[in-house]
Amino acid sequence: MRRLLFACALTIASAAHADLCATGRQQSPIDIAGARKSALPPLAFAYTPAPLKVANDGHTLRVRLAGAGELRIGRETYRLQQVHFHTPGGDKVAGQEFPMAAHVLHKSASGQLLAVVVFFRLGAENAWLGRLWPHIPARADGDHAIAGERIDASGLLPAARGYWRYTGSETSPPCREGVQWIVLRQPVELSAAQLAEYRKHFADNARAVQPLNNRTILESP
């Protein structure tokens, strides 16, 4: 009887998650437009090199970076967790779509999730991605520790640190809301060959933009 009740509870929870993805009012990604200028604090990235560990989860390439530094925003501190990639880029800017974006995920001591978005545009070869792409696992079979390789997430970031901020959600089920999103305004570059290589493994793995539903988008100086 207890096992049956547990199975029923799981079914109800799964249905609730599916409903949130479809009916949530603070979902991500969004089309960033009409942002309000605000005296937002600067982003203080304090990332450190870490052993390279990657995973193909069947949906995206994940780079495991737990313990590899933190991001401080005013009095808030968020520990780096991982980086993964979407193509196309998910969030748009005034209707403009980017060919790819990186989501740099963080978590505070209280469990608050925060994602930093780095957009990519086509251009020169990206040296940071050049260290990752040769190690994309061919199939979803857990984490792969790359012997002798270390990586620093700082190498992914653009030089300018202006950003937009909004409250959104996870972009895949269960689509939990309350996630803080930091979208860096300056894109970085990747080559057409690098984009094509990623898309061999994970094509069209971005969620469509979601309604803003009267949320406020803030823009830093």
Predicted regions mapped to residue ranges:
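Extracellular or lumenal secretory-pathway regions
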Residues: 14-99, 103-221
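Small/flexible residues
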Residues: 4-5, 217
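Bacterial N-terminal signal peptides
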Residues: 6-13
